[in-house]
């Protein structure tokens, strides 16, 4: 378990006002990390999430904007004096059937890649000098199994997750030994967005009927995987599948 404050390590989790990111923030806080909670829009949810955690900080920032990504990292370091873990969870998608090519407009591509790929990159670059000084710096990118198979809520989303994987491995090969870079690639996870979507209902049923573990994932499943990679000091450049065995099909 991480040490107690004021020397406790600091974790920044982007996109952590709800869903997977919120659960990751809560899990890291339970391990003794001081957590920086972030969102671009859901300010009230972000503030409530941070208020429920010990010595947590909420920062509103849109990491798809370079200045905001830098401000987010700078605010975290100014507040705590250090940064040890970065979890790049902020992301977006559109529910677009893969066959509907015309619906995947250039604007959709720019929106999704701008946050999922460029936003992840900008935040990581801003955080890297601080992570390198940590002595145990770790980056975990939250990706998706859509990055490795013809799946996902849209083609632009799947491509963005392929970018996550490449970014993870290239950075791991570049910034070691000072910083480790890994990723988790979840399958279908039960979040308010997926549970309240007609688009995902048949996909969820297919997962429950066909995958080895016969269930969809929970945010807690992803949070445990993230924590495992943060702890795994001899592991870098890995993309950990958290999909109940869907990749075996």
From Swiss-Prot:
Substrate binds at residue 144. The active site is at residue 157. InterPro entries: NAD(P)-bd_dom_sf, SDR_fam. Pathway: Antibiotic biosynthesis; granaticin biosynthesis. Keywords: Antibiotic biosynthesis, NAD, Oxidoreductase. It comes from the Bacteria. This is Granaticin polyketide synthase putative ketoacyl reductase 2. The lineage of its organism: Bacteria, Bacillati, Actinomycetota, Actinomycetes, Kitasatosporales.
